[in-house]
Amino acid sequence: MSAKLHITEIGRVAITAVDQDRALEFYVGTLGFELRSDEKFADGKMRWIEVAPAGGSTAIAIAPPMEGGPTAVDTGIVISTSDIEADHTALKAAGVDVDPEIARWGHPVPPMFRLRDHAGNSLTIVEPTQ
């Protein structure tokens, strides 16, 4: 490839949710993310929502599923925390579908657990070691 690309960052990743209001409540109300955008499009028939951890540079777009597309996936999204024990305990106490235990495989893999939102989309939470 001879042309130089102008890619600067990963700005957002997208997940789908049939019930976007419920997804918004989960990501903002339960996970504590901030709402970055909530706009109608397609002549008001569809809605584009973006949420992110406070101060984070990458947002999660919560989009309606495309016709015939999956409604729940393993998103591949990895969220960092500074206290995995506390977050695992708090999410479990809040009734969030989390792995029963924190996985600890040792160096270089950070401690981690997975959670699933109301739609079944899975995300991974890690506590980086560095």
Language-model segments: which ranges?
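Vicinal oxygen chelate
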Residues: M1-H6, R12-I15, E39, R47, ...
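Core segments of cupin and vicinal oxygen chelate
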Residues: A14-S57
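Helix N-cap motif at beta-to-alpha junctions
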Residues: D19-Q20, S82-E85
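Short amphipathic alpha-helices within nucleic acid-binding modules
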Residues: F26, E85-A90
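Short glycine/serine/proline-enriched coil/turn segments at secondary-structure junctions
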Residues: A42-D43, G68-T71, H107
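Short, charged/polar surface micro-motifs in flexible loops or helix N-caps
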Residues: A54-T58, G68-P70, I84-A86
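Short, charged/polar, Gly/Pro-enriched secondary-structure boundary elements
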Residues: G55-I60, G120-L123
